[in-house]
Each structure stands twice: as C-alpha cells, then as structure tokens.
C-alpha cells in the first residue's frame, strides 16, 4: 500500500516538474510575440489603407505599400511608399532595424525635395500624423523593457512591460495581451507617469496567410484626444524574394518597382 502511495506521489511530482519545465518565461513569450509580429517569412509585402478619424469626426485616409526584409543576423529593413492622397504622394519611409543598437530611420519628403533623418529620440512620435508611432512600423525591441508575466488564462498571456530607460519614452509601462495560439499581441494598454491609461493598440482581425497568422486590421487609439487610426492590410504576401538593395537611401527618391 505504501509503495503504491509513494508511486502516485512520485508521479504527481514528476508531472508538476514536467509542466514547470515547459512553462514559458515572460522574456520568452515576448520574444515569440516579436517573431510572430515582425518576422514571418524571409520578407513580406502589403498594401495598407490608413484611416485617421479625429474626435470631431474629420477623416483622413492614406494609402501606402510596405516592404520588409529580414537579415540573417536578426536585423531587418522596412520600406514604406505612399500612394495617396496627393499631399503625401511619393513620400517614402525607410527603417534599418538594428539588433543591439539604435535603429536608423529616414523620411523622404518629395514636396520639399528633402531627405530627413528621424532621430532615435523621435521614434515615439506620430507617424505621418496618425495615432501610430514611427516605432510601431518596425516594432519595439524586447531588450528595451523589463517583462513580467502578470496573468495567464486559457487563451492569453498578460505581460507588463517597464522601460529600462524611463526618460527615453512617454509611458511608465504598458500591458499587452498575447494570444497563446498565435503569439500575436492582441491589445496593448499604455500608461503615463501618473498611472493613467492614455493609449491603446489593438489587433481587430487576424487571418492565416501562407501559413502565418497575420494581423489584417489594427487600430491605435489616443484616449486623451479621442483620435483613432485604423490600418487595413490587403494583398499580403510572404517570401516573395525581395532584394536587399532596394532598402537603401537611393531608393527613397527613386521608389523600386516592388512598391509601384
């Protein structure tokens, strides 16, 4: 009898130990979320319709093409080319996402014949007048924050993220819900230094495209101003064989055929 009881207890201990050994840490969850959000395939392309709606109801629409290229070392390159409306036509935005150091960002303003470098300190400012930020285009590096798993349900991991350099950002922390099946962040709540929630970014629709879970509708909300920006992604493609040479400054002025 004692031997049976001992065997049952041993089995229970082993099962608990086994489940603990497979439990993901907050850092591992965030790393997988970063991969799911920004690294699907070797490269990618999408058409984007951006709708900016002010609190009073005024609506502005922007249409652009986004390209992404993954380097073998984890670095990435992003190219955004604006097609409409007329005031942003032929404007281009280039990002070199660098692992372990500040990203490089350039904005081409054809109306002014001006190539503008976006300083690292400006990465969390408005992207072309929308409620999305420059940093949202290429993603925030997981290394910039301390991550804590604060809740786990059957469907999501809830992670609290605190910046390692509080003076470099406008938020005190943000809480993100990550889908346990796809590892896509579904909603992020941003809090200011007084503890008030002032911003939300949410994935409103997810589809499987070429085997990759893909956000096809996302929304950023400025809770202080009441402004809302919705991005609708279409014609999404992965592994299309993009050439890294198009992700250079010379193609800011001369957009490659891949975006036209």
Regions from the language model: what does each represent?
Residues 70-76, 149-156, 208-211:
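Short, ordered beta-strand-loop transition motifs
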Residues 7-18:
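Bacterial N-terminal signal peptides
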Residues 27-28, 60-62, 136-148, 195-200:
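A short, amphipathic edge element
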